[in-house]
A protein has these predicted regions:
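Transmembrane alpha-helical segments in integral membrane proteins
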Residues: 67-81, 156-169, 224-237
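Secretory targeting signals
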Residues: 24-71, 101-165, 206-211, 215, ...
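Pore- or pathway-lining transmembrane helices of multi-pass membrane proteins that form conduits
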Residues: 19-25, 165-183
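Hydrophobic alpha-helical interface/terminus motif in multipass membrane transporters
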Residues: 77, 86-89, 121, 125, ...
Length: 241
């Protein structure tokens, strides 16, 4: 708990917490504005109303989420490399793996808050603007959980990368390259390509149905835990030089 409290204070100073809150607010605002501008067009699409609400608005929200994750994960470790602070921690009564885990938990919780804010906006749109009886809260909750889970491999992967590179531009570059390569492969049906975490986060955005894909969800969970485990192992056994 002491390590978590310290990391929370660091998170406020580095701006990680405000960044992810801003992602949630901007995503919610985008959903409102987009639906207001394109309401008639969206409601006339040959799709179920809930599919329109969730899949047609999620694309830009996903981009905001992805770059919010990339920026936040880069920022959360940037402070640790200043003055070689992370190297000195091995000589202090501080568990570096515990610090890594706390950073992961802080990012996860704050990203979950962002997802909740965005989906509250979608819920408000659904209840007020969709035809009577078309809005389904259960479908919204499932899609929200699915979009959160499919974003976690990128969060876990980017935290791992950020923890190993002192120069913040390296993980930023990897994040941008990951997004571009994911976009290029987004419409591929090859299951093998799901090893690419930046492809998984795109799956809800390119789907025409709001129903979660169980295969994608399972791979997302496995990748999240795998990247987390690798990051914890490196924090414990591979000291910073």
């Amino acid at each position: 708990m002491k390590t978590l409290a310290i990391e929370l204070r660091k998170g406020k100073r580095t701006g990680v917490i405000p960044v992810l809150l801003a992602v949630g607010v901007l995503g919610a605002a985008y959903a409102f504005v987009n639906f207001i501008v394109r309401k008639d067009t969206l409601l006339n699409l040959p799709l179920a109303q809930m599919d329109v609400l969730l899949t047609q608005l999620y694309g830009m929200i996903m981009v905001l989420n992805l770059f919010g994750i990339v920026v936040a994960t880069c920022m959360i470790y940037n402070m640790e490399f200043k003055g070689s602070a992370v190297k000195k921690m091995y000589m202090l009564p501080v568990s570096v793996p515990a610090m890594y885990l706390c950073k992961f938990l802080i990012l996860t919780v704050m990203f979950l808050v962002a997802i909740v804010l965005q989906n509250l906006a979608l819920a408000q749109i659904g209840m007020t603007d969709l035809p009577d009886g078309a809005f389904e809260m259960g479908t919204l909750v499932r899609f929200a959980g699915y979009s959160f889970l499919t974003s976690m491999p990128v969060l876990s992967f980017m935290l791992l990368i950020s923890s190993r590179f002192e120069n913040m531009w390296v993980p930023l570059g990897i994040g941008v390259a990951g997004f571009l390569s994911g976009m290029a492969l987004a419409n591929s049906g090859l299951t093998l390509l799901l090893v690419h975490p930046f492809l998984i986060i795109l799956k809800p955005a390119v789907a025409m149905s709001a129903q979660p894909d169980s295969t994608v969800a399972l791979v997302a969970l496995v990748e999240t835990l795998l990247f987390l485990a690798v990051g914890l192992w490196l924090a414990k056994y591979r000291r910073y030089e």
